[in-house]
Amino acid sequence: MGLFLLLFLLLPPCVQAEDVVYLTTEQFKARVFDYTKEREWKYKGDKPCVIDFYTTWCGPCKRLAPIMEELSQTYCDQVLFYKVDTERERELAYAFQIQSIPQVLYVPVEGKPILLKGLYPKESIVQIIEEQLIKRPTPALPTEGGSK
């Protein structure tokens, strides 16, 4: 029992957290936004989220998946990560006009979401999460000069 407790305490906090969660259309409407009842965007969550619209046969989607898994662990206590299979959830894909994949929806707790098409490098995704979802300012570069 003591060894189990020690291992549990030594594990990073996000090992026990959910990874990327697969959403159905109904789950999306319950957790994110019910586009059938609301006209204006109003996010239902209390943490920002990232939603990957994908299909199982899409090459770029397959390359994006491990990046999203990794980032779901990195930001597990700050950002929720979801996936929506556009082949299975056609109504939802249609509602968001998803015609090419992958597309990723970045949803802040307050304000409008950002929908980006295509595969972006991990560094760009991190920058969007940091600046648009977590709202951490980008560190300022030191300026040259000073008193003479």
Residue ranges of predicted features:
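Sec/Tat signal peptide C-region and signal peptidase I cleavage site
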Residues: P13-A17
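Solvent-exposed loop/turn segments at secondary-structure junctions
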Residues: T55-G59, T86-E91, K112, K122
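Short pre-active-site segment immediately N-terminal to redox-active cysteine/selenocysteine motifs
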Residues: D46-C49, F53-W57, S100
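Bacterial N-terminal signal peptides
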Residues: G2-P12
